[in-house]
């Protein structure tokens, strides 16, 4: 489900089936250590749906996507409240881009100078000073118009970072406020609001592997992902949306704080990488993309594609084929068996610092 959903969302965002297909295969391979029969698997699917709803709403402004976001928030709070706060993190890059665009459109300094000139004209009694200030005022107004034109020109033809002022983001802010109260729609009280804070304040942050900081030297594949982003952004003239840049920077920071967030880097930032590669391919290799798509739709192309999918599946599955369902070296199996066989489970309380 996650793989199919990632491909469909990636294809919709980058508008390139070939790029979406190849990056989805790569993402599935990189996610092999994070896929387990845990609530996080459902969370990954919900995060992908969140990105899909946000992007679709910003494009077509249909309110049904806002309802979908509220539903996702309720499900997350009930299924995996530990990651529920991250649901709001996914909104922040879009909100930040909108705020920056609004501030840029204000031209605060020039407008402040215009207001200052008007105040001077009102209080000056000397006609000569008034005329001189009126001339300055007209110059400031012309400067304001030029500044507005320069801003529009820069947005139409940006150098590296694209900034879009989408008024639909106001609705996303409203949905964020509404969703902040959906944490109460659970049978566990205020736990969705306090669980993450209590976990981060506990001593497990220094002992549980997935909570430890990321070390790139020990994680070559994650290093390769970062290198791909840097190579495209530095050595090509491919432009990146400001919201995507914020998302990439924020999740990268989270990865270095805790290695468990690498999964979110692969999933969420995978969409950003797909858009960058699609732009790159569209600009430099449009004809080759068409040829490859035509080749993939032939019988031989379909067989090769199927073989590639099966090969990656075997590579992911083979190391785990001989493993027991429960790894006794990683989980306290004997302790759990002892508790079940010798203690009154229904009337006992076990202290677990992690929970």
Language-model segments: which ranges?
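Specific aromatic-rich, kink-prone transmembrane helix
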Residues: 5-8, 27-30, 42-60, 91-103
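Short acidic/glycine- and proline-prone juxtamembrane loop motifs at membrane-interface regions
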Residues: 34-42
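Hydrophobic/aromatic-rich transmembrane helices and adjacent perimembrane loops
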Residues: 85, 89, 251-289
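Membrane-proximal, lumen/periplasm-facing interface regions of secretory-pathway glyco-
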Residues: 286-343, 355
């Amino acid at each position: 489900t996650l793989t199919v959903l990632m491909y469909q969302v990636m294809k919709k965002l980058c508008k390139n089936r070939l790029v979406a297909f190849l990056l989805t295969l790569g993402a599935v391979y990189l996610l092999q250590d994070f896929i387990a029969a845990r609530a996080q698997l459902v969370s990954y699917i919900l995060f992908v749906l969140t990105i899909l709803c946000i992007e679709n709403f910003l494009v077509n402004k249909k309110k049904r996507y806002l309802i979908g976001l509220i539903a996702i928030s309720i499900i997350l709070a009930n299924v995996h409240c530990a990651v529920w706060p991250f649901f709001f993190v996914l909104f922040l890059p879009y909100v930040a881009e909108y705020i920056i665009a609004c501030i840029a459109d204000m031209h605060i300094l020039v407008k402040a100078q215009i207001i200052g000139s008007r105040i001077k004209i009102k209080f000056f009694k000397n006609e000569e000073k008034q005329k001189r200030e009126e001339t300055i005022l007209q110059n400031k107004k012309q400067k304001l118009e030029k500044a507005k034109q320069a801003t529009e020109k820069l947005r139409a033809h940006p150098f590296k970072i694209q900034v879009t002022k989408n008024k639909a983001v106001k609705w996303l802010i409203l949905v964020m406020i509404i969703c902040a109260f959906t944490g109460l729609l659970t049978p566990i009280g205020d736990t969705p609001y306090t669980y993450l804070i209590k976990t981060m304040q506990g001593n497990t942050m220094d002992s549980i592997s997935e909570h430890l900081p990321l070390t790139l030297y020990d994680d070559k594949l994650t290093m390769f992902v970062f290198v791909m982003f840097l190579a495209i952004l530095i050595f090509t003239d491919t432009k990146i949306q400001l919201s995507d840049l914020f998302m990439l920077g924020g999740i990268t920071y989270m990865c270095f704080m805790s290695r468990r967030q690498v999964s979110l880097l692969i999933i969420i930032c995978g969409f950003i990488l797909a858009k960058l590669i699609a732009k790159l391919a569209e600009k430099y290799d449009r004809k080759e993309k068409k040829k490859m798509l035509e080749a993939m739709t032939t019988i031989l192309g379909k067989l090769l594609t199927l073989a590639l999918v099966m090969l990656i599946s075997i590579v992911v599955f083979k190391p785990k084929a001989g493993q027991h369902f429960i790894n006794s070296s990683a989980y306290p199996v004997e302790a759990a068996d002892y508790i079940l066989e010798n203690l009154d489970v229904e009337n006992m309380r076990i202290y677990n610092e992690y929970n």
